[in-house]
Curated annotation (Swiss-Prot):
Catalyzes the formation of phosphatidylethanolamine (PtdEtn) from phosphatidylserine (PtdSer). The keyword Lyase applies. GO terms for biological process: phosphatidylethanolamine biosynthetic process. This is Phosphatidylserine decarboxylase proenzyme. Belongs to the phosphatidylserine decarboxylase family. PSD-A subfamily. Pfam families: PS_Dcarbxylase. Its cofactor is pyruvate. Its EC number is 4.1.1.65.
Length: 232
């Protein structure tokens, strides 16, 4: 392995959605530095933070149709049975919902939790409440998608928060997705809700750290209890 390959494998790439923000922060740093040199260094630190926020590391995703993988980095904030949002068209019966809260220091690239086919994508405008509170699921701006799998339909909802004001989703109905495939991004703090079809049992608990594309959230027919994810 040459030096270029070593550097490339060491530095975590930045997602293209962040290019314009990183560039804007850097230009602002140059302008501030022209006014007063110490401000340049402050701006440079903020530029580095922006690049860190939009990082897009590679993940090794389990390829098992019996597993539902976390679509987001963050903390498991809720595991409960609720009626899914109407726009998902998943019916009026309660489903198990696992919520993963992302703070401003988490990687915000979202990944498909399962392999399947996108059958519904539904955007709903709303408020920008704290994404950790339960009301955020009903009142906040959100974007939902439904993935049809061999075990039923899995619902995934991107929810904006107080700081997050931009939900990005790249997939469309009838497109296939693989587990761990990038499907969207939410800028600057937010939450992901995952609705489990019948037959899946949660394998995480509230307060546990989740890693997008790696942490097992649920397993089909499982009664084994929580799976501990690695923390990072």
């Amino acid at each position: 392995m040459n030096l270029f390959d070593t550097i490339r494998n060491t530095i975590v790439p930045i997602h293209k959605e962040g290019y314009v923000f990183v560039a804007a922060f850097f230009v602002a740093s140059l302008v501030l530095g022209w006014i007063a040199e110490p401000l340049f260094w402050v701006g440079l630190v903020l530029t580095a933070w922006c690049a860190y926020f939009f990082r897009d590391p590679e993940r090794v995703t389990p390829q098992d149709d019996d597993l539902i993988i976390s679509p987001a980095d963050g903390k498991v904030s809720a595991v409960q049975s609720v009626v899914p949002p109407l726009e998902l068209e998943l019916g009026k019966e309660p489903m198990v919902r696992i919520s993963v809260f992302m703070n401003v220091f988490n990687c915000h690239v979202n990944r498909a939790p399962v392999r399947g086919r996108i059958v519904n994508v539904a955007y709903r405008p709303g408020l920008f409440l704290n994404a950790e509170v339960d009301k955020a699921s009903e009142d906040n701006e959100r974007n939902g998608l439904v993935i049809e799998t061999s075990h039923g339909k899995v619902g995934v909802v991107q929810i904006a928060g107080m700081v997050a004001r931009r939900i990005v989703c790249w997939v469309k109905p009838n497109e296939p997705v693989d587990a761990g495939e990038r499907f969207g991004l939410i800028r600057f703090g937010s939450r992901l809700d995952i609705f489990l079809p019948a037959g899946f049992e949660p394998r995480v608990s509230v307060g546990q750290t989740a890693i997008a594309g790696e942490t097992v959230l649920a397993e089909f027919g499982s009664a084994k209890g929580p799976v501990l994810s690695r923390r990072g």
